[in-house]
C-alpha cells in the first residue's frame, strides 16, 4: 500500500518576496512530494480565492498563515491514511471540505498546495517522472515557449499598457533550439534598448521594462531585436501578446483607456479593430486577454475579426474554469485557454479544463504567475497534458529558468520520442 502518512504546510517566499504556501505530502515509505503555490499580480475577479491573512502588521497583510493552518489542522487530518494514488477522490474531498464555489473557506492556495504535492508524492511512489505519471504513455509534446521579453502593465513601472510582449520561436526544430533562439533574441533586445538609451532593468517575469512611449513602439522594438539576432519575424519567430485588458478597462464608462501611454480611450468595437489592424501589419500569432474579462460582446467581435487568423487566449476570461470555458465555447468566443493551476485550485480541475478545451478544438497554454518560486511543476504538467505551448517568463530570473531547465531535461529524457510542434502549435 502507498498511504499518506503526513502532510505538512509552511510559509515560504515567492519571487516578489511575498509569502506563499508550500506543502509536503509524505508517504508511509518516506517519499516526499513537495509543491509551492504561485501568486498573480493581475488577477481575474472570477479566479478561485487565494487566502491571505490581511493582517497589515505582518507582511503588509500578505501572510498566508491561515492557509497553512487550514492544511495542517483541517485538511491533513482528513487525508492521512488515504491512498496516495487517489488524486481525483482526494481533490474532490478537499473541494467538498471547503464547501464554497470559489474555495474561499480553506483557500485555493491551501487546496492546490496539497493537490500538487499529492501528485508528486504519487509519482515518486510509482517510480515515474511527474509528466509520465500524470500524462501516461502519450505525454511527449514539448511546448513552444511564449517568452515574455518586454514587461508592461501591472508587471512593470513604465509607460506600456499591455502586460507582456512575447516571442514564440516557432521555426525551431526542438525545444532546445527554441530556447537558444529565445535567449539570443533576449540578449539582443538588451543591446537594442541600450542603443536607444533605455533601461535594461527587468520586471516581475524577467522581461525588460523600458520606458517606451507606446505599445506599438514596444512591438517595433521586439521586431528589431529578432532581426538583430539574425532571425526573420513572421518566419522563424512570431509575436504574442498578453494585453491583460481588464487592467485598463473602465467598467463604468465601458472604455479601454491607454492611461500609461497615449491616453487614448477606445470602445469595445474600436479595441477589436485596433487588434485587427495590428494583426494585419505585424507577425502576431497570439493575443491573450485582448478584451476585458466580462466584455463578452467585445470578445465576440474580436473573435469574428481575427479568430481565424490568430490564437485568442482567454486568461481572465476563462480562469481555468470549465463553466466559463463552456460558456465561451457555446458563444464561439476565443479559441484558446490559458491554464493556471492556482486560478482553479486543484490538479483534477486543471486537467478537466484542458480536456474540455481539446474536445472543442481550443488550444491550451500552460502558464506561470508573476509571483513564482523555484517549483517547476508546470513544466511537467505542460508535457503531461500535451499543451503544446507554455508561458513562463523571459530568459532571466531563476524562478522562470527553473521551468525552462526542467523542460530541457524532459526533452533529453524523451529522446527521439519527444515531439516539438513548432509552427503546428495550434493543430
UniProtKB/Swiss-Prot annotation:
Q: Which PROSITE patterns match?
A: ENOLASE
The entry's active site is 205 (proton donor), 340 (proton acceptor)
Q: What GO CC terms are in its UniProt record?
A: cell surface; extracellular region; phosphopyruvate hydratase complex
Catalysed reaction equations from the record: (2R)-2-phosphoglycerate = phosphoenolpyruvate + H2O
Detail which positions bind Mg(2+). 242, 288, 315
Pathway stated in the Swiss-Prot or TrEMBL entry = Carbohydrate degradation; glycolysis; pyruvate from D-glyceraldehyde 3-phosphate: step 4/5
Q: Does the keyword Metal-binding apply?
A: yes
Needed cofactors, names only, are: Mg(2+)
Name the family.
Belongs to the enolase family.
Principal location: cytoplasm
* Function according to Swiss-Prot or TrEMBL: Catalyzes the reversible conversion of 2-phosphoglycerate (2-PG) into phosphoenolpyruvate (PEP). It is essential for the degradation of carbohydrates via glycolysis.
Q: Which UniProt keywords apply?
A: Cytoplasm, Glycolysis, Lyase, Magnesium, Metal-binding, Secreted
Name the gene behind this protein.
Answer: eno
EC number assigned by the record: 4.2.1.11
Q: Molecular function terms in GO for this entry?
A: magnesium ion binding; phosphopyruvate hydratase activity
Which GO biological process entries does UniProt record here? glycolytic process
In the record, what lineage is assigned to the organism producing the protein? Answer: Bacteria, Pseudomonadati, Bacteroidota, Cytophagia, Cytophagales
Binding positions ((2R)-2-phosphoglycerate): 163, 340, 369-370, 391
**Database matches in CDD domains:** enolase
Compartments it resides in: Cytoplasm; Secreted; Cell surface
Free-text remark on how the cofactor is bound? Binds a second Mg(2+) ion via substrate during catalysis.
Q: What is this protein called?
A: Enolase
Amino acid at each position: 500500500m502507498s498511504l499518506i502518512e503526513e502532510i505538512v504546510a509552511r510559509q515560504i517566499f515567492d519571487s516578489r518576496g511575498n509569502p506563499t504556501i508550500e506543502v509536503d505530502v509524505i508517504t508511509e515509505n518516506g517519499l516526499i512530494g513537495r509543491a509551492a503555490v504561485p501568486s498573480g499580480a493581475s488577477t481575474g475577479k472570477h479566479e478561485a480565492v487565494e487566502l491571505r491573512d490581511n493582517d497589515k502588521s505582518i507582511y503588509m497583510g500578505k501572510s498566508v498563515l491561515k492557509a497553512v493552518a487550514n492544511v495542517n489542522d483541517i485538511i491533513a487530518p482528513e487525508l492521512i491514511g488515504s491512498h496516495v494514488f487517489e488524486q481525483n477522490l482526494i481533490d474532490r474531498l478537499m473541494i467538498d471540505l471547503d464547501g464554497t464555489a470559489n474555495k474561499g473557506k480553506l483557500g485555493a492556495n491551501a487546496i492546490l498546495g496539497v493537490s500538487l504535492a499529492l501528485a508528486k508524492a504519487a509519482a515518486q511512489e510509482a517510480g515515474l517522472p511527474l509528466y509520465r505519471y500524470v500524462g501516461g504513455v502519450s505525454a511527449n509534446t514539448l511546448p513552444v515557449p511564449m517568452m515574455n521579453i518586454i514587461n508592461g502593465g501591472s508587471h512593470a513601472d513604465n509607460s506600456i499598457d499591455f502586460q507582456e510582449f512575447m516571442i514564440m520561436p516557432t521555426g525551431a526544430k526542438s525545444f532546445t533550439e527554441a530556447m537558444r533562439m529565445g535567449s539570443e533574441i533576449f540578449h539582443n533586445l538588451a543591446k537594442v534598448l541600450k542603443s536607444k538609451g533605455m533601461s535594461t532593468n527587468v520586471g516581475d517575469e524577467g522581461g525588460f521594462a523600458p520606458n517606451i512611449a507606446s505599445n506599438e513602439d514596444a512591438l517595433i522594438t521586439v521586431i528589431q531585436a529578432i532581426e538583430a539576432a539574425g532571425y526573420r519575424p513572421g518566419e522563424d519567430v512570431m509575436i504574442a501578446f498578453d494585453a491583460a485588458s481588464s487592467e485598463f478597462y473602465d467598467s463604468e464608462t465601458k472604455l479601454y483607456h491607454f492611461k500609461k501611454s497615449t491616453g487614448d480611450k477606445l470602445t469595445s468595437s474600436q479595441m477589436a479593430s485596433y487588434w485587427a489592424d495590428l494583426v494585419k501589419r505585424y507577425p502576431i500569432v497570439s493575443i491573450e486577454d485582448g478584451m476585458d474579462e466580462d466584455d463578452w460582446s467585445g470578445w465576440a467581435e474580436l473573435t469574428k475579426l481575427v479568430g481565424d487568423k490568430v490564437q485568442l487566449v482567454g486568461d481572465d476570461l476563462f480562469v481555468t474554469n470549465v463553466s466559463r470555458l463552456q460558456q465561451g465555447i457555446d458563444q464561439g468566443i476565443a479559441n484558446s485557454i490559458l491554464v493556471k493551476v492556482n486560478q482553479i485550485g486543484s490538479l483534477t480541475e486543471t486537467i478537466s479544463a484542458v480536456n474540455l478545451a481539446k474536445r472543442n478544438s481550443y488550444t491550451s497554454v500552460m502558464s506561470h504567475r508573476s509571483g513564482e518560486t523555484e517549483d517547476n511543476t508546470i513544466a511537467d504538467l505542460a508535457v503531461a497534458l500535451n499543451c503544446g505551448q507554455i508561458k513562463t517568463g523571459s530568459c532571466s530570473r531563476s524562478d522562470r529558468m527553473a521551468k525552462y531547465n526542467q523542460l530541457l531535461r524532459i526533452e533529453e529524457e524523451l529522446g527521439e520520442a519527444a515531439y516539438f510542434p513548432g509552427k503546428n502549435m495550434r493543430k
